[in-house]
Amino acid sequence: MIPDVSQALTWLERHPQALKGIQRGLERETLRVNADGTLATTGHPDALGSALTHKWVTTDFAEALLEFITPVDGDIQHMLTLMRDLHRYTARNLGDERMWPLSMPCYIAEGQDIELAQYGTSNIGRLKTLYREGLKNRYGALMQTISGVHYNFSLPMAFWQAKCGVVDGEDAKEKISAGYFRLIRNYYRFGWVIPYLFGASPAICSSFLQGKPTTLPFEKTDCGMYYLPYATSLRLSDLGYTNKSQSNLGITFNDLHEYVAGLKRAIKTPSTEYAEIGLEKDGKRLQINSNVLQIENELYAPIRPKRVTRSGETPSDALLRGGIEYIEVRSLDINPFSPIGVDEQQVRFLDLFMVWCVLADAPEMSSDELLCTRTNWNRVILEGRKPGLTLGIGCETAQFPLPKVGKDLFRDLKRVAQTLDSIHGGEDYQKVCDELVACFDNPELTFSARILRSMIDTGIGGTGKALGEAYRNLLREEPLEILREEDFIAEREASTRRQLEVEAADTEPFDAWLEKHA
């Protein structure tokens, strides 16, 4: 089932320097909660400045949903330590609140009024909040409070020069984009390995079902928790953060222009379902527009091709201008065993897997085949640890045992690990392979199995509160290592100033501005 990558791996072993200079970044979302686990109703902490313009800490859907962002970094330890500094400083400035350590929220009642993230009075700030109003009205606020980790990854120019013979300009744009699309297609085919190893949401609180009937064979504990005994990541299931209305958009990952055309089509295609919501009620705007996607970011995807946007540029315009610059992996649950929601083992694994995905052959995929890849993901998400589970290739009928496929993949990853270790010295990457491959013979070692044992004992709420309290105490006590207190104070003031400048620069009323930008 695994493509034959031996030639590409041999090439890599001859050109190890091609992997020198991998760049990465992390984003981690987390809900601010009270000591009893309920959602904090306070505004964004003053110590963190402006959520609109702060370079390290912002908010996602809700005012209480923090998002930590590391700068682009070539050093794994430095990136993780900086992420930890962001958590340390925040923990010291949350009063009695703490950061929820799980992807799935718990103490949020159906229909509870969740305050949307606020970004001030500028047109762009109001647009961001209106977009979130649209998300709430389309999908419900509860789904939007699910948290995850995003891992951003780019290969050095030396890789593309050695592999594809790229030179500067248009040639580089096309060849590098084609290489990243190959990575993305392989991710759709084999990325289920991420929830298998690191999925950490095998259970949900009853409020998540919102009284709707479900065909999933949930088991229920006395405290009202629903779980599937072999599930890995319900966050990635239809109960979690997905968007069924997008599955027939026909967006593919074969070609830059084709992909962008599909994306642009989706933001212009009217939706009868969303038209029923309306654009306004009692003088209050309900969504940016009633199209299938309000803006491009609404496209749900487990992985995204990205380029840093310039002022006023949409994500797809940036891609057309310069091609794909980096990849955003979006399938990581919060790691409940780490105070910062992600750890070094995961980052090293993702490095290895991304390199494998860019090396392995990846035939072009129609939108139908893209949908077929969802079958494997769903199996792993809902019953990944089930004995005897099999997976298929695309839309074909042949089936293969998951543990065998996983171990075959890791045989390749071990060779990538040896190459990366040869550049950096030590055996860190190989050690990660040895630790993780054991999960295929013993699923009890996976994140989902480990956290489910705790959840069955004390419930999602009990588990989340205990971990949240422990991490709060730990982070508050740890000294900062890279950033200093004065760096945070300076950024608080600078971000507040930048927000005021954005607000002062607006010349049009919001409604008129929105007509042009929506």
Swiss-Prot record:
Catalytic activity: L-cysteine + L-glutamate + ATP = gamma-L-glutamyl-L-cysteine + ADP + phosphate + H(+)
Gene Ontology CC: one annotated term: cytosol
Keywords, in A-Z order: ATP-binding, Glutathione biosynthesis, Ligase, Nucleotide-binding
Domain of life: Bacteria
Cysteines engaged in disulfide bonds, as pairs: none
Entry EC number(s): 6.3.2.2
Stored InterPro entries: Gln_synth/guanido_kin_cat_dom, Glu_cys_ligase, Glut_cys_ligase
Gene3D superfamilies: 3.30.590.20
GO molecular function: ATP binding; glutamate-cysteine ligase activity; metal ion binding
Single GO biological process annotation from the record: glutathione biosynthetic process
The protein's annotated pathway: Sulfur metabolism; glutathione biosynthesis; glutathione from L-cysteine and L-glutamate: step 1/2
HAMAP family, alphabetized: Glu_cys_ligase
PANTHER family: GLUTAMATE--CYSTEINE LIGASE
Family in the record: Belongs to the glutamate--cysteine ligase type 1 family. Type 1 subfamily.
Protein name, entry field: Glutamate--cysteine ligase
Organism: Citrobacter koseri (strain ATCC BAA-895 / CDC 4225-83 / SGSC4696)
